[in-house]
Regions:
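Glycine-rich helix-loop "coupling/hinge" segments at transmembrane-helix boundaries
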Residues: 169-172
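Membrane-water interface segments at the C-terminal ends of transmembrane alpha-helices
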Residues: 1, 7-121, 149, 153-167
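Short hydrophobic faces within alpha-helices
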Residues: 13, 55, 126-134
């Protein structure tokens, strides 16, 4: 009871929930677009992205946080590169919600994308071709076939991302 009546505890819970919801929305949006690209294109770029998008899963989280800190801090790599072009770019992404959300997205995109790619791979090409044969354009095919057939897996990905972030203590 004290947890929900204390003003500091309540503010912390609301802040954590807000960061988690924003992270879930952005992660699922990026992951779904990436999964669509990986599923429906077959070229060298998509094969390269299909290999490299899993990279964050193999980097320990503490190492990734430290690496990102050296890149996005006000005296980090982004600022030094901008100084070469005469700008003093201070991203302001460290020690605030934007930095936490950025790191949470980095950690969760591979996992959510794997789930959604799996769902999209389960949609047979014949289903999409059938819809196009009866005159459906790409937008109609997406909203009437692809999205409804993949929404359950998207909800699963959302649940995993939500649960991973609501209890995450990796990124301070």
């Amino acid at each position: 009871v004290y947890l929900f009546t204390d003003e500091i505890s309540t503010a912390s819970i609301v802040y954590t929930f807000w960061i988690t919801v924003v992270t879930v929305i952005v992660t699922i949006a990026i992951s779904y677009l990436l999964a669509l690209y990986l599923r429906f294109t077959d070229n060298k770029v998509s094969k390269f992205i299909g290999t490299i998008y899993l990279l964050p899963r193999f980097i320990p989280s503490l190492v990734a946080v430290y690496a990102m800190t050296t890149i996005i801090r006000d005296s980090g790599l982004l600022n030094r590169i901008s100084l070469l072009f005469g700008n003093n770019f201070k991203p302001g992404l460290l020690y605030n919600a934007k930095g936490i959300i950025l790191m949470n997205i980095w950690f969760n995109i591979p996992f959510a994308t794997m789930i959604i790619v799996s769902a999209l791979s389960g949609i047979q090409d014949s289903v999409i071709e059938s819809a196009r044969d009866v005159g459906a354009n790409q937008i109609r095919v997406f909203f009437s076939m692809i999205l409804p057939l993949s929404i359950k897996d998207v909800m699963i990905a959302m649940t995993f991302v939500f649960m991973g972030n609501i209890s995450s203590f990796t990124t301070p």
